[in-house]
């Protein structure tokens, strides 16, 4: 599986504190093996959130990871709190 990072995702990660970055990294390690395995992705709270194939996963209590999955490529789109993710989705 390939992993692609958008510029916006990279910018979001740079804006996080050290603890939040570590939590994002842990979620990223779990994400590829959790796709297609409901019993594994339950802990990440993965769910499809947009009809265009955008998904969300929890990173701790306050952060959400937004990604797309197609053609064996996981594209990391955004990371932010619930409100930031909602604003992003309104723009789609």
PLM regions: where:
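A short, surface-exposed loop/turn module that caps and links secondary-structure elements
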Residues: 30-58
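Enriched for short, Lys/Arg-rich terminal
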Residues: 2, 8-15, 21-22, 58-92
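Residue-level detector of alpha-helical recognition elements and their boundaries
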Residues: 24, 28, 39, 43-46, ...
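Residues that recognize and position ribonucleotide moieties
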Residues: 2-3, 47
